[in-house]
Amino acid sequence: MSARDGNTASEWVPTGSVTVRVPGKVNLYLDVGDRRQDGYHELTTVFHAVSLLDEVTVRTADTLSLEHVGEGADSLPTDERNLAWRAAELMAEHVGRAPDVAISIEKTIPVAGGMAGGSADAAAVLVAMNSLWELGVPRRDLHALAAQLGSDVPFALHGGTALGTGRGEELATVLTRNTFHWVLAFSPGGLSTAKVFAEIDRLRAEEDRTLPPRLESPEPVLAALASGDPAQLAPLLGNDLQPAALSLDPALRRTLRAGLDAGALAGLVSGSGPTCAFLCTSAGAAVDIGTDLAGAGVCRTVRVASGPVQGARVVPAPSTAG
């Protein structure tokens, strides 16, 4: 096959590499509706991008490849089962080219941790290929491609804080007047998003009396974010999936309790879990609480983070000027 037929990138793709940093997310509010006919659940959520970043580098290559290093790297597939791989194929298909890139991902976001690390990496691949190949695909089209890949991928492009509706892919920017400080507690294992959603369906079908009432309007959360006051935000944090995550991984109750005992304003399971996120009064308080939590024996590791931060962005190349 020659380069002239448009199916290879060899004669017109710039050489080199592009690196993109992309954040994980915490769901400050996650209202899960009933299961829809298409298998998805209707969601209303407040996404919040935090400073736990994966770094994704995309290079020109003879064929598509994928490698990981860092957090949970050994457990991740390096083929079409990986969302980052599928993102490369989708972008290439969108512009009529072969996906001839080598993808290297340095993981910091936990795998299967409820922080959308896989979605973040997919978003980063879209941004990196758009830059590497000098495509000029507009942000609106990148968002549409992201939505084809998964519900959380558009927010990884968007970043900041956003209200998500539909299955989470329809986004509206949320005004946030402050930097919020978090302690993130990683669990020894992961939780399957599909299994957590199935568990909340089961608990609801059985009318489990331990289930808390479903969340109401997100408006108080949005008002607290606009105020910039973590003490106002703390009692409003909520996650309809948390009872399902606790049902599948009861040890998370100890983690949540330990974070509050250490002085966090509030704690909740992030998304489908099992990562637990603790809101703190300040950066200094987050360091102290993280230190206490790390020594409590209730989680695998602890990270301190802040938000909101921007979504997937190209890392500027180092200056070569003398």
From Swiss-Prot:
GO function terms (MF aspect): 4-(cytidine 5'-diphospho)-2-C-methyl-D-erythritol kinase activity; ATP binding
Keyword terms: ATP-binding, Isoprene biosynthesis, Kinase, Nucleotide-binding, Transferase
Pfam family, one: GHMP_kinases_C
Residues that, per the record, bind ATP: P110, V111, A112, G113, G114, M115, A116, G117, G118, S119, A120
InterPro entries found in the cross-reference section: GHMP_kinase_C_dom, GHMP_kinase_C_sf, GHMP_kinase_N_dom, IspE, Ribosomal_Su5_D2-typ_SF, Ribsml_uS5_D2-typ_fold_subgr
EC category name: transferase
Gene3D superfamilies: 3.30.230.10, GHMP kinase, C-terminal domain
Reactions it catalyzes: 4-CDP-2-C-methyl-D-erythritol + ATP = 4-CDP-2-C-methyl-D-erythritol 2-phosphate + ADP + H(+)
Enzyme nomenclature, EC number: 2.7.1.148
Gene Ontology BP term (one): isopentenyl diphosphate biosynthetic process, methylerythritol 4-phosphate pathway
Active site: K25, D152
Source domain of life: Bacteria
Pathway given in the UniProt record: Isoprenoid biosynthesis; isopentenyl diphosphate biosynthesis via DXP pathway; isopentenyl diphosphate from 1-deoxy-D-xylulose 5-phosphate: step 3/6
Summary of the function given for this chain in its UniProt record: Catalyzes the phosphorylation of the position 2 hydroxy group of 4-diphosphocytidyl-2C-methyl-D-erythritol.
Family: Belongs to the GHMP kinase family. IspE subfamily.
NCBIfam families listed in its UniProt record: ispE, PRK03188.1
Protein name: 4-diphosphocytidyl-2-C-methyl-D-erythritol kinase
